[in-house]
């Protein structure tokens, strides 16, 4: 190199303009020229990567990266769309070092191990580029495979000379960036270990200066990252640098090794001061932290930016943190964006490769041990499904370059090779399409085994589920999309709920009927509902009620265990082979010879089953619950003189009812059942459905035997439907009974429609439970139940619902006295047809502090139990399920977003809501003591549901995502 070079841009010619702005060097251009040698050597990958990373840091909100432990992991990262790669010293120590041994992160491995891994990564990326280019018509890869690598140089493996040599080795390996930490190399520890010892500030500056010198000598604008471990290090080698003096605890004395002790109280400020000293010598600064805290990051960034406003930072999103413990899901979603806005431009997960490899292999091995080849087939199904996202490793021969070397072979032999490897391989024969044929494919399960599930999750049953979902799930999703559009039109005042003029002829035609009612369903005067746990199934069927509705929906928390154990319990109950022994009292529970008729409520159309995937997409919860039950039990029930009977929840339109009708027909044909064998009752629990009663019955006329007044969800739907319209503000929910005008009109309209069509009109739920410790309160509660059931029987309902076996005798007495026949379908109501105004009239009442607090308390209590796997919860002497929690949170949302006033004149605002949630959370936590609970998570969800801009459709969908993410 000529001595004519005057500045470092002439020495590092590839550096873009402004690259070294603010960078300080304690050496001269002449020093670089003297050390470079007489021949220029190009380091193409390192130079290209450094400039690319520099550009990304200045154009992206932040650059995310994962730690790669192998070359293939890096290939998959780039294929998935990541633009940078991290090389972790911890991962090198654990399983990627040149000694071939396993070490903790204490710089015990050979110093060349990191550069060797960088070489392997770049070679793998090069091969991926070559393979893709070889297959392309223009011989160019579709993407830039050479993602810049930021590599871990630990503490330099020694002094400044070691840092110099290590930087050169990383540049030769093609690294784009390198970071050095300010620990003592001989005592080096992982950033999340104890016993870390800092070196003096001046000594680390020499290390940074040495690494910059090495990059300049190589002519590469390598990104240098200075890491400080001052936040959690409590020891310092020497007090030679006066800049370290304010942070030394001289009173504590020195350690046995002679190290100085550091003050605990000044850790963040020490990081800031060290970062300010390092800033002129580095491109980015990294403060290693002991927990993910936005406040600490902001304090650090603002402290450095006071002196160096343009300095960028790196952030370790460490696997050593328990992320869920520190951050809520909503906080996690915005965590990296907030960091990026503060200047943390390079954000990485150090040990991603190690944990991804360890967990995925353990999970496969565990499942392989239990399921054999079904486990590996499940992995393949996941691979097939990922192909639509760009995944290609399912074709592993092609992935590693077999086709590429076939091209080499053909080139060598002039195109005459007869020994190419990919042609004729099993991969070519079996993996030409992303998935197996439909006849061969079943579906993939992502959850753990449940004891006894082998009799439920049989290959034939899974194939039936696959067929049901393939046939009907796309239509379900379209109908859900239509729901959203209808709601948007109401929100924007483009449409108001009304009767459909196009079906007026159908409504007025008195000549058609619903389905013929089976003998064992003629008398339904008392129906008991509840979840499908084993004890509940036995007690409910033995309760004296005519019908037991086994519930997979509102009174169920849809964990995988609950869904599978529920199916197992119903399978056994259908065969009169169910028993239960209480684990503490040892009391035995068995099924009586005479018991209730069984009906099953699957989940609503809106709920997915995320543990069962087809093409990596969730299946329908409705079809899962319905499909498994009908597949295993339909013929057994028919043989007993009964049949497969269902309750259908959450329908909003006749189109959704028609979907169920088509599912029934398909199922009957598929399972060899006579048309009309499947019977159903539809819950009218949405305001929009009340405008389509006749249309819903007509859609299901071959199967339907009744409608039911789902009162709690109906009130919730009223709030949700008119969520954007202030004039529909409701009073406290306990002021809205079935005698409220819009509720009474709806229930009478249900009776009128049902009896006209020859089917049952079922009354609503009595959620009260016996109050054993207070006879006066119990008598009062039972009096309310009695009055409600008398109203139902007088109006013409053919039966009613209760939630507790203790209410069965009371409800039965009322209907026995007032309905001597099995039903009163012959009782036709002659009242005038309802108008849209009748069905939407706004109830009068007040909003009280007690009602406001009760809504918060009920929703918190319910969500706490729901997240723990229990969907039916006794609260305040009522059996609460999802419906009552939905009313409560929806009212809170409505009141907050429309500035509703309490009767004492206070406006319900965000402050009052958050304050009350916090107070109720604290009260519940104190009361819970050491009992396992999910109250904090429940509070997070409740605050989200109440304060969000747009009301969520169902709280159970968001809460379900949390269950699935936690492996339940």
Swiss-Prot record:
BP GO terms, sorted: determination of adult lifespan; glyoxylate cycle; tricarboxylic acid cycle
EC code: 4.1.3.1, 2.3.3.9
Database matches in CDD domains: ICL_PEPM, malate_synt_A
Pfam families assigned to the protein according to its UniProt record, in alphabetical order: ICL, MS_C, MS_N, MS_TIM-barrel, PEP_mutase
Keywords: Glyoxylate bypass, Lyase, Multifunctional enzyme, Transferase, Tricarboxylic acid cycle
Domain of life: Eukaryota
Cross-referenced Gene3D superfamilies: Malate synthase, domain 3 (3.20.20.360), Malate synthase, domain III (1.20.1220.12), Phosphoenolpyruvate-binding domains (3.20.20.60)
Tissue: Intestinal and body wall muscle cells.
Gene Ontology MF annotations: isocitrate lyase activity; malate synthase activity
Active-site residues (renumbered): 601, 881
Claim: Transferase is one of the keywords in the record: yes
Pathway: Carbohydrate metabolism; glyoxylate cycle; (S)-malate from isocitrate: step 1/2; Carbohydrate metabolism; glyoxylate cycle; (S)-malate from isocitrate: step 2/2
Ranges for region Isocitrate lyase: 1-443
Protein family according to the UniProt entry: In the N-terminal section; belongs to the isocitrate lyase/PEP mutase superfamily. Isocitrate lyase family.
Name listed for the protein in its UniProt record: Bifunctional glyoxylate cycle protein
